[in-house]
């Protein structure tokens, strides 16, 4: 986990790589799950009643499909990791660089259907935070606890597709997980005292500790 905490920001990125199975001609990581906020959202907020949307120009002006709900002109960080992240494998006689090799972009939970969920799902939501109330003044959002619940629902759907829980767990244990969340807990919570009470209840240090503790518990649920 990479974490940065100071008086005004907390940015957390988690990459969990449990195991990689090399299969000739196939994706080196069979599935990829994404949790977070607007830095990773790829369309989950499109149909929500919220000001935190990006499904209109100039967002997406450099993306092949135009505006999709990504809060960027083109690909976001999750897209770049999925397509270009390289993994080093120590072979017997030489080092080899292997591309993750996902054939397409991971779908947002809001529109993921059928067997495509076996390749992964993006649960990220603009304005979402570690704390459930974060970003509420902007409208609806899928906070981290709800993203984790959505992942649980995805797993149940995967069990139906795969046939049993044991095989599903074996599949999940080879997947890549990324979480990028926490900045909204400051810019859309702690630093908005007219809307939220956290600024008056906690010192900056206390609030940072509170976020880290809650985040740690959420990661245990995810894993």
Give the residues covered by each predicted segment:
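Conserved active-site regions of diverse hydrolases
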Residues: 2-223
């Amino acid at each position: 986990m990479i974490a940065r905490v100071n008086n005004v920001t907390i940015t957390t990125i988690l990459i969990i790589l449990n195991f990689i199975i090399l299969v000739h001609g196939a994706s080196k990581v069979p599935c990829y799950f994404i949790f977070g906020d607007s830095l990773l959202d790829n369309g989950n907020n499109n149909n929500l009643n919220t000001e935190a949307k990006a499904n209109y120009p100039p967002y997406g002006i450099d993306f092949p499909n135009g505006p999709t709900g990504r809060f960027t002109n083109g690909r976001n960080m999750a897209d770049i990791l999925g397509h270009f992240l390289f993994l080093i494998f120590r072979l017997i006689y030489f080092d080899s660089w292997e591309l993750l090799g996902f054939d397409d972009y991971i779908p947002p939970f809001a529109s993921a259907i059928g067997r495509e969920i076996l390749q992964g799902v993006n649960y990220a939501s603009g304005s979402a935070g570690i704390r459930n109330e974060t970003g509420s003044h902007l409208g609806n959002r899928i906070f981290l606890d709800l993203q984790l619940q959505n992942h649980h629902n995805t797993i149940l759907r995967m069990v139906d597709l795969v046939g049993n829980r044991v095989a599903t767990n074996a599949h999940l244990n080879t997947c890549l997980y990324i979480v990028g969340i926490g900045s909204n807990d400051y810019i859309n919570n702690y630093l908005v005292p007219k809307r939220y009470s956290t600024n008056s209840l906690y010192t900056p240090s206390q609030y940072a500790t509170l976020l880290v503790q809650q985040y740690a518990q959420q990661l245990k649920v995810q894993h």
